[in-house]
């Protein structure tokens, strides 16, 4: 009996040891996987030193050809060992792929290497007014309403969902939410065909408007056709292409990035700043001058920011408060493999003056699931802390500079620690 119990004990013990070993390996594998980037960008004819200190090695291949290792190419090495510093140099644009192994044995992740020409952008850090028209009418809510007899109606509850976009009414494009409201009020209760877009699927639904208590025909939906606010312009290129915010325009009702048709940038004036405090984020408040000529056209709204064409004839608006006018000559960008923890600066506009303030980059997440939170930052500049309490709403898009290069842009503030926040890599913004 004792022998049998001892055998069971040994089996259980061995199983537990094996489980601990497996879990430990999975933890180590995942940890190393997250520390090695999935992509690396090199600028042509510039040495790049990579220091990851990981027990990972690999072979560099020409992209699309993984059968034969690269022997003679623009890149100076064909074997890499990420347990020590790796120096790469490329003489002309080309794409490569690194097939890696963990501990030199276990197949690991693939790393894409892109060799690109030098990129320069003009860091801005100036607040602008934003006005964007949705691509269709965004449905934010459906519900019931009563007619004059107290009978409840919900014409759209079963067929339309919050987050849907209404593109057409009876085959005709809708110009605005007022267009929809007036057309429904004049429909005399006849059934209506709505063209709906839902998660890239477009289809038609039939709905029958009903009268409300006032005798007006309604559908029982609440829609939006635009978004507006104040944000920070991150950069402008030499050709006038711009990026701003560092994150997309999000509708708070549906917590999703808006699909936009078009929009504009306008001049804005910050009238006041409410300092951030623990538990309460600060914010910039101001006015947008919609009546004046637009500064630029908004063309795209992505997860990483808003993008479009800036009117280069109106660069004086961006220059008026800029302390360092030499920034207009352009600045190189820092790719994520160049960025490191430590001192950096944020370029933002406070009291109509655009200047640098000190921050630190505390953590870098090379493979962040949320690209808007690829860096964790802390405001260390005493003057900025005295003026704003740290990061405030409206600063999203303020460019971050490290080692004389544009590294990223501010995106979020930590509500319980307003001196801390998150940022996006500038290379993520420049992909669009």
Regions found by a protein language model. Give the residues of each.
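Serine endopeptidase catalytic core focused on the charge-relay Asp
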Residues: 15, 210-389, 393, 402-403, ...
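Conserved PDZ fold ligand-binding element
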Residues: 69-77, 156-177, 400-403, 407-408, ...
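Gram-positive cell-envelope targeting signals
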Residues: 1-56, 233, 418-432
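PDZ/PDZ-like domain micro-motif
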Residues: 144-165, 396
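Interdomain regulatory linker/hinge segments that flank or connect interaction modules
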Residues: 2, 14-18, 23, 27-29, ...
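PDZ-domain C-terminal substructure recognizer with occasional recognition of PDZ-binding tails
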Residues: 100-118, 181-221
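Short extracytoplasmic
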Residues: 46-75
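PDZ domains, with a preference for the canonical peptide-binding region formed by the helix
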Residues: 82-93, 168-201, 417-419, 423-428
């Amino acid at each position: 009996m004792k022998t049998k119990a001892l055998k069971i004990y040994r089996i259980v013990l061995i199983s537990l040891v094996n489980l601990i070993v497996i879990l430990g390996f999975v933890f180590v594998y995942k940890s190393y996987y997250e520390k090695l980037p999935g992509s690396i960008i090199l600028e042509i004819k510039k040495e790049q030193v990579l220091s990851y200190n990981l027990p990972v090695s690999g072979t560099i291949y020409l992209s699309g050809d993984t059968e034969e290792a690269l022997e003679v190419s623009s890149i100076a090495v064909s074997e890499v060992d990420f347990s020590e510093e790796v120096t790469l140099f490329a003489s002309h644009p080309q794409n490569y792929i690194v097939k890696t192994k963990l501990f030199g044995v276990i197949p690991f992740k693939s790393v894409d290497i892109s060799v690109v020409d030098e990129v320069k952008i003009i860091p801005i850090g100036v607040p602008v007014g934003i006005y964007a028209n949705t691509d269709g009418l965004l449905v934010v809510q459906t519900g019931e309403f009563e007619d004059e007899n107290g009978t409840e109606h919900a014409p759209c509850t079963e067929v339309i969902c919050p987050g849907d976009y209404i593109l057409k009414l009876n085959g005709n494009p809708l110009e605005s939410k007022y267009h929809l409201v007036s057309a429904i009020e004049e429909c005399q209760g006849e059934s209506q065909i709505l063209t709906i877009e839902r998660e890239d699927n477009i289809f038609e639904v039939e709905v029958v408007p009903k009268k409300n208590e006032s005798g007006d025909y309604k559908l029982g939906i609440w829609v939006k056709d635009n978004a507006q606010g104040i944000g920070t312009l991150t950069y402008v290129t030499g050709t006038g292409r711009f990026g701003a915010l560092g994150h997309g325009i999000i509708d708070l009702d549906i917590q999703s990035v808006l699909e936009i048709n078009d929009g504009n940038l306008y001049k804005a004036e910050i009238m006041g700043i409410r300092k951030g405090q623990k538990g309460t984020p600060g914010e910039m408040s101001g006015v947008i001058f919609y009546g004046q000529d637009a500064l630029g056209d908004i063309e795209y709204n992505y997860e990483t920011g808003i993008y479009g064409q800036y009117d280069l004839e109106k660069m004086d608006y961006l220059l008026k408060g800029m302390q360092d006018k030499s920034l207009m000559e352009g600045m190189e960008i820092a790719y994520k493999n160049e960025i490191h923890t430590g001192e950096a600066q944020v370029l933002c506009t406070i009291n109509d003056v655009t200047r640098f303030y000190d921050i630190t980059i505390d953590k870098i997440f090379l493979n962040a699931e949320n690209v808007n939170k690829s860096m964790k930052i802390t405001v260390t500049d005493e003057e900025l802390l005295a003026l704003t309490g740290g990061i405030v709403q409206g600063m999203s898009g303020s460019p971050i500079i490290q080692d004389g290069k544009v590294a990223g842009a501010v995106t979020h503030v930590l509500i319980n620690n307003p001196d801390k926040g998150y940022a996006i890599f500038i290379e993520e913004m420049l992909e669009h």
